[in-house]
Amino acid sequence: MYSRLFFSILFFLGCCPALFADTDSPQRATFGQPAVMLGIAIVFFYFILWRPEQKRRQAMEKRKSELAVGDKVTAMGIVGTIAEIREHTVILNIASGKIEILKAAISEILKAEK
């Protein structure tokens, strides 16, 4: 019931400019309104999507640079404890032995085991 009323009001409001438009004056192509809307969309995406992701990525890179032997990490669903740190890779102790993974593959850094 209310949805029909809501959509009827939206339809009417959408048609209002067409109903009351001055048909004698020629339509002018304006660059301003689409440019403003595009600018608003870009600002919206920057502050809502790109900026928080950039901050999260920088924080994760900082945490990866501070990795230490004994830290517990997850990589591709594998949970392990860091046994050795190399330039681009990390050796993890897991239940059945050791594996070598890339630092870039580490998705989460858990608390160090003490």
From Swiss-Prot:
InterPro entries: Preprotein_translocase_YajC. Its main location: membrane. One of its GO terms (cellular component) is plasma membrane. Pfam families: YajC. It comes from the Bacteria. Keywords: Cell inner membrane, Cell membrane, Membrane, Protein transport, Translocation, Transmembrane, Transmembrane helix, Transport. Part of the SecDF-YidC-YajC translocase complex. The SecDF-YidC-YajC translocase forms a supercomplex with SecYEG, called the holo-translocon (HTL). This is Sec translocon accessory complex subunit YajC. The gene is yajC.
